Amino acid sequence: MRSIRSRSRWVFPLLFLLAAGCTPPGDDGSSESSGPSSPPQLTLTADADEAAQVIDAATLESMIASLADDSLAGRGPATEGDQLTRTYIAEALAECGFEPGAADGSWEQPVELVGLTSHMPKEWTFNSENDTLSLDFWDDYIGNTGVQEPSVSIDDAELVFVGYGITAPEEDWNDYKDVDVRGKILVMLNNDPDWDPDLFAGSRRLYYGRWDYKYESAAKAGAVGAIIIHTTPSAGYPFQVVQTSWTGEQFEAPAGNEPRVRLTAWVTDEAAGRLARLGGLDLDELIASAHSRDFRPVSLNVRSSIAFESTVNEGTHTANVLGILPGSDPELADELVVYTAHHDHLGIGATDADGDSIYNGARDNASGVATVLAIARAFSALEERPRRSVLMLLVAAEEQGLLGSEAYTNDPTAH
């Protein structure tokens, strides 16, 4: 088990989160501010400060240790550790006086999954007019099927660099420029434009910067594959995280009629540089050209074929855990104050230098679950329940693409 640590600094922000669920008597939360510049007013109920004292570092550390214990095997979706985690959360909420919050009167909202294990080729070959390049699985690239089918075959597809792969009308940004990329493999930068605070959200990542958006945008454009260029600054994590997160069984929601690329992949920036040079181009120059609204897709002068098999595991599931504390005011009890964190992690994967193959996920996200449960304990210590109902929503399969959050927002049927 990888070591974990707790810090008392976590406690103080939690006091604000507890206060967010409390309004003083006589305040229905609907009063108008005195002007557009007036900050929102937050007032603690009389006993909120005392109730908050149940939140302490020792309690947080204990809950994190339990959730990150080897016995939960990394909390991978649709595993025994996943079920044990959900049981732990439900029991903790019940001890705090919360009631089951799912529509059927249980603690759990099912999240249907399809498991996909892609068996990628050891070498992926690319050809230019005059040369050939092979990228090694694991060291240079990580790939997966983009479709819920047992076989994928792509034949002699052209590679096209599409900058960030973003179409955002509200930002006057379109990397595709209506260029026909049907049947092609698209190569794109990670994240979204972040060098200018007036572009997108500056350094804050929007959905446009997420890997799932990029694969979706490529599919809508008719591409057969999409490759994201990884850099540690743009991703916020090293390529090792890609290696451990995007290998083994991957989970998705059951496919609908939405367009999908047949191949999703990541490459290191070093491998991307070799791909660019194979076609007589320079990666740094391509990246620089993408830093403009005037960017247009660029052929890499490279083509590739790839074929692989996948194991498709249909009919599996995980679940969101929902606990609700009914509000005390009949006129406001139908309104919800929601606290949320995801309860899943990466499960069991490649063995590290110490022989450990369990990805315990203390920070990601046992700490978040412990935070929500600590707030629940504080609510249970209040002498009078909040006027609005409080929902503790512990979502599943975040690591697989926000699947639990999507399931809840598609069907927010709590209480």
Feature roles, as predicted:
Residues 135-255, 259-263, 326, 334, ...:
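Extracellular/luminal Protease-associated
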Residues 18-21:
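C-terminal motif of bacterial Sec signal peptides marking the signal peptidase cleavage site
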Residues 220-233, 237, 245-246, 251-320:
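Long, well-ordered, tryptophan-enriched scaffold segments
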Residues 73-197, 299-302, 307-309, 313, ...:
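Noncatalytic luminal/extracellular "stalk/propeptide" segments of secretory-pathway proteins
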Residues 25-102, 123, 334:
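N-terminal hydrophobic or amphipathic helices/low-complexity stretches enriched
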Residues 135-140, 151-152, 177, 253-284, ...:
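Metal-dependent peptidase/peptidase-like ectodomains
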Residues 204-209, 213, 217, 234, ...:
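Acidic/histidine-rich catalytic neighborhood of metal-dependent amide-processing enzymes
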Residues 2-12:
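Bacterial N-terminal signal peptides that target proteins for export
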